[in-house]
Amino acid sequence: MEQLLHYVWKHKIFPLKELKTTTGQQVEVIDTGLANTNAGPDFFNAKLKLDGVLWVGNIEIHEKSSDWYKHGHDTDPGYHSVILHIASQIDTEIKGSNGERIPQMQLSCPESVYANYKELLETDSYPPCYRIIPSVSSFTLHSWMSALQIERFEQKAALLSERLKRCQGNWEDAFFITLARNFGFGLNGDAFEAWAHRIPLRAVDKHRNDLFQIEAIFFGQAGILEDFDGDDYYLRLKKEYAYLQHKFELVPMDASQWRFLRLRPTNFPHVRIAQLACLYHRAYGLLSRLMETETLQEVRDILKGGTSAYWLTHYTFGGSSPSRPKTLSKSSLDLLIINTVVTFLYAYGLHKGSEVLCARAGSFLEELKAENNYITRMWEQCGMKAGNAADSQALIQLKKEYCDKKKCLYCRIGYEYLKRK
């Protein structure tokens, strides 16, 4: 209920006239203030008139006024600047840390808002607001989508920042781990990330001119060179890895982490590892090259990949198959660009203070085709069709950060739903 009161106050969903404090002072709301999601009062820099006198300060909201004491605000100097305490139930007077009484106002949630909110939380339909989406103005939807796009950029940049810290600020290492994870295309994402942490790029750099040696490191660290028997290529890789393992003190991962169930052969870990080995053999300074690209085609040309000759006729070690190039499909390339390259362009742009790189990240998304997955298909059924990858990223953000977490109070579509009569 307290969150709902925050919502009612923020959006002024209450009678603006005849508002009074518990002691009878007339209240005129000029500005409800800026919502605070961190520690401290709920709204900063609100502007009110109490009996015609202008007050500027903070607002605190509780379900019961006694919660003020329950939460220890009476002894916290951080709440000294509260000019009005709002509660749906007034059960006691309150005082600040300086001992002065703080004005209070009783505020109830309108019945229609409460009923709509309860409906959103309890409905079995998904998303619960689907009925009203067709009636929401295009301006509201477009502005909300734009905000979600930026929010997703910022969220991904924050996650990348944490990864960078774990990589001691090394952008190349962070990029390799991110790229490898996304090469898992969902099912093997965790396994590829664990594998990438075991790949010493400095060792790879020393053998970059020899694709066979890079493959030996990559496959060996994946834990899939442990069998005693195999074809000639497998046995040569195994022997080469034994030498490199001793040279660089390498410790392989447990091969049981890899998943094969329900995977198409082109998505088998062996094929993806072979593609990554070829990519790092061909593209020296991969991250720098990608950050310098100006067109999507340049990015695709760098990432399009390929494999050594052995993998033209194999999906795993052993049994052969008809010869077929193992290059990344356009849809797979685009997913790697969306989830890896664009993210790094934006984050690196922030790091360098480069508006050009940040803008390029946005323009790449707008140029890329919208993702086709269960989330985008669900929104399309509700009347929200993604026109490009920027839109599909926004819709993914909407589902994961608002719908799944029931944060309807913070969603602009939820706002339209709640204000219905």
Predicted features by range, described:
Residues M1-H6:
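N-terminal "leader" segments that precede or initiate the main folded domain
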Residues Y7-S66:
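N-terminal ordered "arm"
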Residues A39, D76, C411:
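Short, structured segments at the rim of ligand-binding sites
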Residues D42, A46-E93, N98:
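A broadly used, surface-exposed interaction patch
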Residues S65-D67, I90-T92, E111-V113, F185, ...:
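Short loop/turn segments at secondary-structure transitions that flank enzyme active sites
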Residues H80-V82, I86-W144:
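Compact, glycine/acidic-enriched structural inserts
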Residues L148-A394, K407:
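Hydrophobic, aromatic-lined core segments that form the binding pocket/scaffold
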Residues Q393-K421:
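Cysteine-cluster motifs in flexible loop/terminal segments that predominantly coordinate metals
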